[in-house]
């Protein structure tokens, strides 16, 4: 009986505490541009993330960019052109690994993009510099690596276990 009373009092306190909490709004907004891998080139891994009520997005992976932005416009997520989202809303890219289903949108859209930072680990950055942005497979839109540097993108290497400030 004593345990039952204690449990009831505990549940009442937890319930009261739950009702007294203020409703918290989401701190971030997420816009999926692509959520798959494989053969569907219009739906490859790419997510825009921004603090709520801003247009300051970082793109987490970049498999699909333009097609995903067009889909987001169609779904009324954005009320501006795809070009404006690409050039002004996306402030940088954070690339998890250099498989094409995670970077093809970054590569293909680089001629139309504005200057921004690409963040990746050393191994990932080396793959992008040596195999994609190398002035042979594709123009080097970066500021490092082989060939002529167009310098559209600043390549910033991330150190595992260290915090990195995202610019812009």
Q: What do these predicted ranges mean?
A:
Residues 39-98, 104-111:
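Pre-active-site segment of Zn-dependent metallo-hydrolases
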Residues 3-57, 64-66:
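Zn-dependent metallo-beta-lactamase
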Residues 117-125:
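Short internal beta-strands
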Residues 57, 116-117:
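A residue-level structural signature of the nucleotidyltransferase/glycosyltransferase Rossmann-like core
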